[in-house]
Swiss-Prot record:
<keyword id="KW-0630">Potassium</keyword>
<feature type="binding site">
    <location>
        <position position="33"/>
    </location>
    <ligand>
        <name>substrate</name>
    </ligand>
</feature>
<feature type="binding site">
    <location>
        <position position="244"/>
    </location>
    <ligand>
        <name>substrate</name>
    </ligand>
</feature>
<dbReference type="InterPro" id="IPR036918">
    <property type="entry name" value="Pyrv_Knase_C_sf"/>
</dbReference>
<dbReference type="InterPro" id="IPR015793">
    <property type="entry name" value="Pyrv_Knase_brl"/>
</dbReference>
<protein>
    <recommendedName>
        <fullName>Pyruvate kinase</fullName>
        <ecNumber>2.7.1.40</ecNumber>
    </recommendedName>
</protein>
<feature type="binding site">
    <location>
        <position position="244"/>
    </location>
    <ligand>
        <name>Mg(2+)</name>
    </ligand>
</feature>
<dbReference type="Pfam" id="PF02887">
    <property type="entry name" value="PK_C"/>
</dbReference>
<dbReference type="GO" id="GO:0030955">
    <property type="term" value="F:potassium ion binding"/>
</dbReference>
<feature type="binding site">
    <location>
        <position position="74"/>
    </location>
    <ligand>
        <name>ATP</name>
    </ligand>
</feature>
<dbReference type="GO" id="GO:0005524">
    <property type="term" value="F:ATP binding"/>
</dbReference>
<dbReference type="InterPro" id="IPR001697">
    <property type="entry name" value="Pyr_Knase"/>
</dbReference>
<feature type="binding site">
    <location>
        <position position="67"/>
    </location>
    <ligand>
        <name>K(+)</name>
    </ligand>
</feature>
<dbReference type="InterPro" id="IPR011037">
    <property type="entry name" value="Pyrv_Knase-like_insert_dom_sf"/>
</dbReference>
<keyword id="KW-0479">Metal-binding</keyword>
<keyword id="KW-0067">ATP-binding</keyword>
<dbReference type="InterPro" id="IPR040442">
    <property type="entry name" value="Pyrv_kinase-like_dom_sf"/>
</dbReference>
Amino acid sequence: MERRTKIVCTLGPAVASADGILRLVQDGMDVARLNFSHGDHPDHEQNYKWVREATDKTGRAVGILADLQGPKIRLGRFKEGSTVWETGETVRITVDDVEGTHDRVSTTYKNLAKDARPGDRLLVDDGKVGLVCVSVEGNDVICEVTEGGPVSNNKGVSLPGMDISVPALSEKDIKDLRFALKLGVDFIALSFVRSPADVELVHAIMDEEGRRVPVIAKLEKPEAVAALESIVLAFDAIMVARGDLGVEVPLEEVPLVQKRAIQIARENAKPVIVATQMLDSMIENSRPTRAEASDVANAVLDGADAVMLSGETSVGKDPHNVVRTMSRIVRFAETDGRVPDLTHIPRTKRGVISYSARDIAERLNARALVAFTTSGDTAKRLARLHSHLPLLVFTPDPSVRSQLALTWGAQTFLCPKVDDTDGMMREVDRALLAMDEYQKDDMMVVVAGSPPGVTGNTNMIHVHLLGEDTRIPK
């Protein structure tokens, strides 16, 4: 059986060629991530084209995710490029545009002096350097260095616990979003989500561009953790972005946030990605640490739809080895069968039908579950149940097929639009009897809507024996 948990790979200089990306697809990449925190539009456009070319060559459906930078707060530039702050020193972070010195440097967050209060923490470079606000003098925030270390131009600053006043989309994000939509990406990931309402700003831009695609909420802020259930309901998918999350909330809370996010996302049939530092040591090394292997396996056993690679594939020494290694770890974890069952009992029509179809298929010892879908919803509702049976998904929409590349276990087939149930069964027979894995009279449990092609109309479970419809055109 194919690997069920999907792999997201971040593109970058290490794979920036047609052959490099083709090999990633062949190694097992299911979704390509364009990271708009780095690179420029021509770079992303070229990578996009290479992914689509690789999809055409291999026949594999590979989704493309545009990850917006978000309102990232950064230090300004230092006159010398960098400095080292020692523990116990006093430094000034100013909203004035100044050339940075050892003692005083600017920030991109122009409301810092208004929002900061004595006792507030400022964490630089993913928490490697720690500051605490002592006082505010005019446009300067006076800080004591609590954890010293090197700092350099444009390093990121996290403000855990501070009520900051920044929009969900920066001007750069809006430009990047419009560009990505015109390009044709399959997903948008929104950084530093704080509230369910943040998705409305993205939808407004999408409506102006005349194109809506799924929006992924990145869990990185304490506010997002507090509003987790409402954010899951508002967005189309979730990413547990453990890097920034581990800076913003206490480190020991991150594993439990991950488990809770996966559980809530599964209950609502929303795909969930676990991201950041999964095989981080493989940026330099040919083998992961044992802890990293356990981390990947535990994400699989928690029930994640996908696991994500960042620097490992974008700038790592051997990105192809990384993907193959992750795929091996995932496959072995999946053989264990310990993903907890969905304790949430569905109450909606589509939820109950998918739940019943899973039970029928497993009790009848069917060869596979089959879904016909125009939106992808039926497939996601079946996927969250994590049946041991293959999940074969038929759709007439190429974009839906690409979007299902993020959904656990979904093996997708592009098919023509059909007019009735007989047409569906003919498409199932045509596709599956051409494969070595399936033979005539194999039992399939098919979930669909009748009449076909109506979004949200899932209302049918059909037990089908391959080849029983003799009207398949020769």
